[in-house]
Amino acid sequence: GVGLVGSEMCIRDSSIADYITLNISSPNTERLRDLQKGDNIDEFLHSVKTLHDNLKKVYKKHTPLVVKIAPDLTNQSVYELSQLINKYDIDGVICTNTTIDKSSLSEKYKDIQGGLSGKPLSTKSNSVLREIVNNVSEDRTIIGVGGIDSWESANEKLSIGANLLQLYTGLVYKGPQVIRQILRY
């Protein structure tokens, strides 16, 4: 299936990684987001998890496996994905990648390719984060991403239930000192 070859290569090298991200949500890869739906994701996670478990036996090392999801999923899709994350004992979820929803942009920017990140992503990302927190097993690691550029936005993700945070756009616009500002509180 789509994405399995790359995932196999990554998992085979997992003995040198701290964790592996299955990014099934990139808006820049044609048909990749289709993996988040129905039988596609079930088959994909089953195949990847089987390979992951086999390699864990070979290398005698558990490298956590996390799935990075899109903010554009419906609540029903997030629920179904949560059930599969539980079923296949996936270690964690990264909530979320960039959005393909450009409705908040002015007309002149709506046709630009790629995903929208940063502050415009916060509401959607937090909604998906909330659904994931409510539906995956408590032992899963939840990584909050999307619109983090201050202590307040970081704290909001943690208050919803994220265990860890990732940020990128905040670093681009505010520089590395944004990390110190967040950690100062």
At which residue positions do the language-model features occur?
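Glycine-rich phosphate-binding active-site loops on the catalytic face of alpha/beta enzymes
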Residues: 24-26, 92-102, 153-181
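Catalytic cores of alpha/beta
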Residues: 73-87, 134-138, 148-165
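Short beta-strand/loop segments at the ligand-binding rim of alpha/beta enzyme cores
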Residues: 55-71, 132-144
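Single conserved hydrophobic/aromatic residue that forms the stacking wall/gate
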Residues: 1-11
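Glycine/Thr-rich beta-alpha phosphate-binding loop at enzyme active sites
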Residues: 28-40, 84-138, 174, 178
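Active-site glycine- and acidic-residue-rich loops that bind
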Residues: 7, 33-41, 66-86
